[in-house]
Amino acid sequence: MGPADSWGHHWMGILLSASLCTVWSPPAAAQLTLNANPLDATQSEDVVLPVFGTPRTPQIHGRSRELAKPSIAVSPGTAIEQKDMVTFYCTTKDVNITIHWVSNNLSIVFHERMQLSKDGKILTILIVQREDSGTYQCEARDALLSQRSDPIFLDVKYGPDPVEIKLESGVASGEVVEVMEGSSMTFLAETKSHPPCAYTWFLLDSILSHTTRTFTIHAVSREHEGLYRCLVSNSATHLSSLGTLKVRVLETLTMPQVVPSSLNLVENARSVDLTCQTVNQSVNVQWFLSGQPLLPSEHLQLSADNRTLIIHGLQRNDTGPYACEVWNWGSRARSEPLELTINYGPDQVHITRESASEMISTIEAELNSSLTLQCWAESKPGAEYRWTLEHSTGEHLGEQLIIRALTWEHDGIYNCTASNSLTGLARSTSVLVKVVGPQSSSLSSGAIAGIVIGILAVIAVASELGYFLCIRNARRPSRKTTEDPSHETSQPIPKEEHPTEPSSESLSPEYRNISQLQGRIRVELMQPPDLPEETYETKLPSASRRGNSFSPWKPPPKPLMPPLRLVSTVPKNMESIYEELVNPEPNTYIQINPSV
């Protein structure tokens, strides 16, 4: 409103009296003029209008007319947001006036939800909103004056708005709020509503006893875990709203345990699983390798929930140690480290001589000397070792092979096989052992004894055959004498002389003297005296793993046959034509004695 309107408000509202009371008629020259200077007069006060231009200046007295106070009404006086239409009515006795509307002492700014009648006396709010609540007034105005009605209040009911449940003592984790077991938690439901709402709380499908917008639970346990709901209701709007909040109670953490999928782990196996076992449910899991956080890779992979560690292509250096840690925002607990036992090998097999570390392929050793061979291979668990000699059925078990006294029979190729029963693998290698020393007869003592016995047996058979022939030839002359009488006078032949000698054609020269044997040769078995045998190791050295009680490759025992004693049945007074044959090495002797 400008300055001119303000002046008019004070002055143009003054009405001059329609008739002037004068006691005399003023001369024609007299004129009624208004002083341009503002008068210090207020509304409804008497105003003095001076008349200038006459010798006597009479005074004219008048009074301004007041505007009537308008009245206001609303229908309905209480409205529901987004539902009702509200109409305001302004009534006044004055005419030739304009109506202005005021809300909360401010001129109303009209918008699309409002309608105004042509005379301005009816104001309609088509769809009422909560911001339409407040006091309303109408004001009647003319050129100089205005008059405002008493205020009227519009009550707009609304709500409840969407409910938000807050937990003061919890920690949000996504859509879940976590609280520690044993602590306290306070719930608060926030919403906007007029009039205030009624609150109903639920835990799962159970109705709680709390009916206010806030409540507290002390000493929280796992029983207090779940989905909380708050139902707010407005009895005026007949509307309701439901808010939800999921609460997770974090229990006191216990130590987890790392459990492998198998205890018999073998190198190069396809995979092995390590599981972090814990009785706690709502926890996070983190893995550690050798005390440091584990970094996943193609070789070490984690499951979606981090509770399983998968080791692909198990290697011997994947022993760990491994540990897992369970945690929440309130506490942590880590397992004891687990060291894996991974079986592998055997790797390449090595044969060394005694305590030497260099691998050898050929060994020369003196005859009758001792020899120690060591076989080893990298393996877990330790490998089992088996020794064999080429072209021999004997075997020896253990890392070490000890030969106390080398003989010619120990010469050859020795094989050592290392095996691992858990991995199912075996590897072997060999070494050539050459026994060197002074050469002896190519025949063993047993072979020589056999040859001697064979020769003597042939001699014995030949002697018996010669004796038989001699007897037969000796009997032939007597038959001729009986048949031919001319022989009866012949002289007897002395005992020293033999009437008939076998011809050189019937006996070989070697057996020409057998005819002198008078009697049958008898063969007797003579038991040899007890001789000490060659001594071998009967107990493996302490380095042997199995402690076998047999010695490696004991040479086959020499065939010991009882000695033959050839006893002649010829007369004792006949001179012996054979000497005693003694073979000291096999302790076998043969004696041929002539008959007496």
From Swiss-Prot:
Modified residues (Phosphotyrosine): Y578, Y589
Ig-like C2-type domain boundaries: 58-154, 160-246, 256-341, 346-432
Transmembrane intervals: 451-471
Keyword Glycoprotein: yes
Pfam families to which the protein is assigned, alphabetical: Ig_3 (PF13927)
Intervals, Extracellular compartment: 31-450
Keyword tags: Cell membrane, Cell projection, Disulfide bond, Glycoprotein, Immunity, Immunoglobulin domain, Membrane, Phosphoprotein, Repeat, Signal, Transmembrane, Transmembrane helix
InterPro entries, A to Z: Ig-like_dom, Ig-like_dom_sf, Ig-like_fold, Ig_sub, Ig_sub2, IgSF_CEA-related
GO cellular component: apical plasma membrane; cell surface; microvillus membrane; plasma membrane
Cysteine pairings via disulfide bonds: C90-C138, C276-C324, C375-C416
Sites carrying sugar chains: N96, N105, N280, N306, N317, N368, N415
Region of interest (Disordered), residue spans: 477-510, 527-563
Signal peptide (UniProt feature, chain positions): 1-30
Residue intervals on the Cytoplasmic side: 472-585
Membrane topology: Single-pass type I membrane protein
Subcellular location per the Swiss-Prot or TrEMBL entry: Cell projection, Microvillus membrane; Apical cell membrane
Post-translational modification: Phosphorylated on tyrosine residues by SYK, SRC and FYN in vitro.
Record's compositionally biased regions (Low complexity): 501-510
Pro residues biased stretches: 553-562
Cited CDD domains: Ig (cd00096)
GO molecular function, one term: protein tyrosine kinase binding
Entry's family note: Belongs to the immunoglobulin superfamily. CEA family.
Subunit text: Interacts (via extracellular domain) with PTPRH (via extracellular domain); the interaction dephosphorylates CEACAM20. Interacts (phosphorylated form) with SYK (via SH2 domains); the interaction further enhances CEACAM20 phosphorylation.
PANTHER family xrefs: CARCINOEMBRYONIC ANTIGEN-RELATED CELL ADHESION MOLECULE 5-RELATED, CARCINOEMBRYONIC ANTIGEN-RELATED CELL ADHESION MOLECULE 8
Role description: Together with the tyrosine-protein kinase SYK, enhances production of the cytokine CXCL8/IL-8 via the NFKB pathway and may thus have a role in the intestinal immune response.
Name the UniProt record assigns to this protein: Cell adhesion molecule CEACAM20
Organism annotation: Homo sapiens (Human)
Lineage: Eukaryota, Metazoa, Chordata, Craniata, Vertebrata
